[in-house]
């Protein structure tokens, strides 16, 4: 898990709320502090974070790991931010990308040749958490001379029946 500003701020908010609530039970400030420290992670991961996921598309970020990318495709959206920010794939060959990400799931449409192109690789990133999210996240790699020249993310709307 990548420690972000949002994660730290939300932990602080949960800690303050837990401390204020526990302080109403008794006046012993050291006991209230100790119980608040113990209760904060429990309250965060069992109450605050699930409620946050229901109403927003906030999610934790993870460091990119090639094994996790291939083993847990539904969690790829957590790793793609690091790939984009650090340009980890720019300049890599098709063989190197295939070794890290696996075979492309589909080829993108190229308007210039009016067909699917072997130079536009697409990967499904899964759905970000949220009760009202029907957007599937996707990653497209654009190759020039068999090396990655650009990458972009986009969303596909899925209809659930």
Outline where the language-model segments fall.
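Residues within mature, well-folded domains
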Residues: 2-161
């Amino acid at each position: 898990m990548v420690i972000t500003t949002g994660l730290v701020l939300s932990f602080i908010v949960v800690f303050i709320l837990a401390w204020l609530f526990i302080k109403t039970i008794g006046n012993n400030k050291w006991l209230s502090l100790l119980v608040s420290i113990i209760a904060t992670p429990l309250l965060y991961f069992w109450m605050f974070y699930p409620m946050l996921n229901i109403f927003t598309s906030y999610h934790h970020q993870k460091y990119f790991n090639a094994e996790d990318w291939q083993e847990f495709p539904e969690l790829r959206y957590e790793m793609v931010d690091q790939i984009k920010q650090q340009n980890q794939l720019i300049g890599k060959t098709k063989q190197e990308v295939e070794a890290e990400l696996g075979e492309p799931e589909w080829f993108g449409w190229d308007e210039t040749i009016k067909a699917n192109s072997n130079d536009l690789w697409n990967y499904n990133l899964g759905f970000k958490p949220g009760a009202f999210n029907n957007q599937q996240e996707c990653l497209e790699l654009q190759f020039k001379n068999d090396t990655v020249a650009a990458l972009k993310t986009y969303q596909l709307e899925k209809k659930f029946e």
